[in-house]
Amino acid sequence: MGSKLFTIKPIQELLDEAADNKQGFKKALTATNLTTLGIGGIIGAGIFVLTGQAAAQYAGPAIVISFIISGIACAFAGLCYAEFASMIPISGSAYTYAYTTLGEFLAWIIGWDLILEYLFAASTVSVGWSGYMVSFLKDLHIYLPARFTAASGTNLIDIPGTGWVTRTADLVKDLTSKGIDVAALQHTHAIMNVPAMFIIAFLTLLLIIGIKESASFNNVMVITKVGVIIVFVIIGFFFVKSANWKPFIPPNTGEWGHFGWSGIFRAAGVIFFAYIGFDAVSTAAQEAKNPQKDMPIGILGSLGISTILYILMAIVLTGIIAYPHLLVPDPVAVGVNSMGDKMFWLRPIIKIAALAGLSSVVLVMLLGQPRIFYTMAKDGLLPKVFSRVHKKFRTPYISSMLTGLVAIILAGILPISILGELVSIGTLLAFTIVCISIIFLRKKRPDIPRPFRTPLVPLIPILGALFCVGQMASLPVDTWLRLLIWMYIGFLIYFIYSIRKSVIGLRTGRDLYRSKEGAILAGVYAGYSKLFNVTPMIVRLLAILFLLIIPYSLLWVLYPKLVILRLAVSAGLTIIPYLIAWSVFRTKSG
């Protein structure tokens, strides 16, 4: 009785797919296109926000060291992605890499997890784009209706002289301290975030029209934001005061993570997320002209250029203004103000750069997700409709339309905080699996030609995986619970649909009933069936209640505040194993 859930896709089959020019995608991307694609995915508004805030709270001028540490740590994962992308130039990214090393079930988990990284990221960043666009239009005296510029149900209040803003407890406290009667102000609730929905719809249409057109748009956005960053850095150097860099490493306050070397490492963890996005380059592998050579250049080149820009921004920003003054939503704008009235013209240009940066990030995320859907559909784990390629545009138009539609709905109704944390944990999980997969494949298939080789294996992959796991551990418990719920849904889809439609499973005549996993599921199914047939009813109810109490009690100890989420996870842990077993064995018992 062997393992069937972990069937590995033959790597030769992937290499044959990569060599097949009839896959449908247009091979139009050069090394330059791939590099700008990576920069487009990495550099968003974070460079204008995280740099100042991390310096003010954790590291001071030594934020420069934090960027170097974080860049090196992210490069560990980048090196692993570069080896895989050059060796297996298929659009599936981490999903495909896991399929060749860890098997189908774990590949499905990663593919399902990547939805959190790409689709949810597109929605998250589009909400940020909306905020910058509303602010930019206000500078031009163009005012959008407040009810259509925030997530559905968001409580808004109209502050005289400021306009409509989101009501928060801190804002109410601040207004009350200033003698303003908050109850007397106008209140309303947002309906949907129209600007966020608009940018997703526009970019989805662009991606359907063609990869070449999308790459050209991305190039313009990247040139715009990088150009503005370089202008700010050059001008800012003339306003640097060396006194602002002293002490370069502020002494620790006595609390871990607040300045000193512990603050440098804490800041490195915070700004790590400013590097996320380079992996999206690997989803365009089948559209690269020379993927074996150009994919590593695109992945590592974009990481290197972004790191240099981050470091230069950190040096200038902490040099023109003392770091304690950077704890604001727009630290770069504060830095521009410190240069004097003559430099006021830079403020709207910074906003334009932020809009360009966010636009390119949304584009890259919307590009990556449909190509992962396409690859999963080719493997039979998703319906075949997801693998359709437009005859004229040669893009996965059905997957692109679905991705865009779901992203539009999420961006229109959900707040950015929930979306952002799910993106972070989903991305880190994918990075971890890719790092581990490199070690597996080096041992299993050392004979495969590798145009690019990750150095110092297994040290580099292990360091990459450890750093990512460490970052995941720092995320809130409720984010982990949301991830578990998301994975429960994925398990159901896999066992109800994907395991039956898998191309490899059908081709090899996989019989789950005769596998180790089948024996376990059969036991679960039999146990629950007996439980549900117990009489009297009170015994049945008590048994089910007991099964619910065990996980609920554990979650209550870990996180006592989220009652509804505890109930949901406990119910999932109790019911989902039965649903999975039932879906597999219902035909056997029928």
Question: Where would I find each of the regions flagged by the language model?
Answer:
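Membrane-interface "cap" regions at the ends of multi-pass membrane proteins
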Residues: M1-G52, A56-P61, C74-L79, I88-S91, ...
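Extracellular loop-to-transmembrane helix junctions
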Residues: K26, L50-T162, T166-A169, K178-G179, ...
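Hydrophobic, membrane-embedded alpha-helices of multi-pass small-molecule transporters
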Residues: L29-F48, A190-L203, G236-F239, G254-I308, ...
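TM-loop-TM module centered on a large, flexible mid-protein loop between adjacent transmembrane helices
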Residues: T96-Y97, G103, S135-A151, G161, ...
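Membrane-interface loop-to-helix entry segments
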Residues: S130, T188-S242, I299-L303, G420-I433, ...
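Hydrophobic alpha-helical segments and their helix-loop junctions in multi-pass secondary transporters
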Residues: G131-H141, I223-N252, I315-I321, F431-I448, ...
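C-terminal membrane-solvent junction of multi-pass transporters and transport-like membrane proteins
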Residues: T188-I191, L203, V385-Y397, F431-T479
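A generic transmembrane alpha-helix motif of multi-pass inner-membrane proteins
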Residues: E421-L422, G426-T427, L456-I504
